[in-house]
Amino acid sequence: VDLIVGFPEPYDAVTMKSPDGQTHLIFDLICWNKYGSMANFNEIIRNLLTHELTHFLIGYYYPEADAAVESPNYLTKLDAYTFHEGFAHLISFNATEIDNVDWHSSQLEKVYSSCKERMRAALAETDPEKEKQFLYDAICGKYYEKFACMCGMLYLANQWETKGMDGLKAAFSNYHGFAAKTLL
């Protein structure tokens, strides 16, 4: 765990590998200042820690999916982002156990619909400059607009609701094509 100051926006917490392959959980304490005046500061920090630990564990248990985040192939990277972020957001969502969340609230239904539109466009994109922007938007920006994060999370929530732990295990077994699976 590395506590630092000065990591580039928008990253307040990230999981990264050092040149020697060691995984680091990096938390920028200056970026955390924006959470200091919030009443639910403890929940936010717990969510950040849970989220980044999920990335760490994915890297440990599924190194191929972890390495794919650095792939030069656009669709492979989009699959890896959606996989990684889907699990991390599912497990850390609102500091709430996944079976205590109303995954079909009107807000989340609207979010899923909007993010699926963005995911469809991202999957169809072939222009390299637009692909770069889609990859950025997939995981950066306003919470509910990070389309890979939201599509992954809500797809996995559905797997949980319909198939339980077996559904999550099946989803975890293969990140290939994961972005497209979230549209089903």
Describe each PLM feature range.
Residues 31-49:
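Short pre-active-site segment immediately N-terminal to the catalytic Zn-binding motif
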